[in-house]
Amino acid sequence: MAEEANKDADISSLSLSLDPEIIGGQNNFLENNLQQIFQKIIQERGPFRDLKEEDLQKELQKESIKDESSAKSSETENVLEFATLDSKRNVNDTEVESMDSQAYKKELIEQIMIAQTECSLALDMTSLLLSKFKENSIETISPFLKSTVPPSSLQFSRSQPPESKESDATLAKCWKEKSLTSSCKFLFEAKERLTSVVETEHEYYTELVKVKEASWPLFNSQGSNHLSVQYSCLGGISLGLGLIRMKPESKSFEVQSSLLYSQAALKISILNKDRDEIGSSTWSWPSQNCNSVLLKDIYKLQEILFEMDIWNSLLQEAQSCGNQGVNFTGDEILVPISDDHVVRITLETSSKNTESGFTEDKKSNEDTSTNFVTIKQEKELLKCLCDTLNAIAHILFLKHCRKSDRRSQQPELYMAIDANAPLILRPLIFYYNLNQESLEFQRWLKQRDISFKFMPNYPWEKAKDFLELENSLSINRLSISWRIMVSNFEPAIFIQHTPTLHGTDKSVWRCKDQYSSNQFSSLKNVCQYIEHHINSLSRRSKKTE
């Protein structure tokens, strides 16, 4: 009860002045007692809608006269003060005293009038809308609107249509024609777009069918709507996946790969003692007879990757061939074949393959026709030798990539590297050394006028297909027979040469005459044996004489 009495006392002491500067200082009190303040305003001022602007202006004039006659400090001690509407003003500012209070009051009244008009209009429209359903809503309508507008007038079911004109039919027809024309154009453009999409999809899957019929495996790429083709499945040890996509500019399909080179080929050259190239061979693949551009791209990528795999395998094998004089860097592999000649193996990655040829010095232009023919023949022989070495390297690498269990004439290839190192350089060195050793033995026999018959038994000469050729080139042991006729009256000497690529068997020369059978581990010992045999025959002939 004491608290309610204090509240009544506080409200009774509240001054309802129209000057906003007089009210202030007790904002919390006003916020907590707004309902009681509204009751006091209605008691003293009456309903808000009955107020008139003239009465408010007269009251403002009276208050302004009263404010001018009283002291500013004594009259505002027991009066609540409201904060000014302008947030930028400060109560402690010294410029507040010099402001024109009349202009500020006028601005406040204008804002109140605007708010009153908006609230009154909103109340009238809401009451007029609800007057059809609630009868007491009529009481909140303003007297002027109540006298001019009937209740529930906002609920009319329809408005009166305008009068029809002769041009309405023509206008409607024009709009319909325009609508049909635009719809037809839109449908035609949609048809063209769909036709283009369907034709592109048809062409795309037609190309995929051609790729699939050519035995190229296709895979679904994760995170992409396009398929990938494995272009290394027919050879090589790398995976080789390419994404099949369409070129936006040419509307054609291509295989996007991660290869660094647009063209690659293995090149084998022969260098002289001055490191000049006297013969070379760059590998080239035969052209594929196919009408599909996509298949041609796949074959090209396969050839590039295959050549890169051969080069990587040669580098891997060269690391274990140092005892045979093989030197290698990241760009070339050097294999010595004699004191004056070296075989160089490189990977050509230029856009155009360089033509292999014989490097002639300036003196070759002054040679006679006989020397020219000799040089030309030497050039052809060197070119043939390089081509042979290049072909054998490709065959041995293909053998390295194949599985051990083959099926008929179409063996499957696998992508993993064998546990054993590749066998490409070592067989080439083995075949070349064997040939040089045979030529050296023949020259030695000719110098001594010894008749002989060379009877090699090379397994690749009997190969009937490509698989047998692969197997024959990778055979570990060969067999070469010699028939030496030292005299017309004595039986011939039979020599069986069995060179081995691997192993610890050193007795590779087996010599048999009418008196004994011997085994030797080198050609030098064989030559000494033949000389000893000839000397023995000569001594016997002298004794008989």
Swiss-Prot record:
Kindly give the InterPro entries that the UniProt entry links to this protein: Mediator_Med17
Molecular functions (GO terms): transcription coactivator activity; transcription coregulator activity
GO BP field: positive regulation of transcription initiation by RNA polymerase II; regulation of transcription by RNA polymerase II; transcription initiation at RNA polymerase II promoter
Q: Which GO terms describe its cellular component?
A: core mediator complex; mediator complex
Per UniProt, the ranges with Polar residues bias are 149-162
| Record localization | Nucleus
Which Pfam family is an annotated match for this chain, by its short name? Med17
Q: Any idea which UniProt keywords this protein has?
A: Activator, Nucleus, Transcription, Transcription regulation
Major localization listed first in the record, in broad terms:
nucleus
Q: Where is this region: Disordered?
A: 148-168
- On whether Transcription is a keyword of this UniProt record, the answer is yes
Gene3D superfamilies, alphabetically?
A: 3.90.1150.120, 6.10.250.2620, 6.10.250.2630
| Purpose | Component of the Mediator complex, a coactivator involved in the regulated transcription of nearly all RNA polymerase II-dependent genes. Mediator functions as a bridge to convey information from gene-specific regulatory proteins to the basal RNA polymerase II transcription machinery. Mediator is recruited to promoters by direct interactions with regulatory proteins and serves as a scaffold for the assembly of a functional preinitiation complex with RNA polymerase II and the general transcription factors.
Q: How does it assemble?
A: Component of the Mediator complex. Interacts with med18, prk1 and rbp1.
Q: Which family does it belong to?
A: Belongs to the Mediator complex subunit 17 family.
| Official protein name in the record | Mediator of RNA polymerase II transcription subunit 17
Which organism does this sequence originate in? Schizosaccharomyces pombe (strain 972 / ATCC 24843)
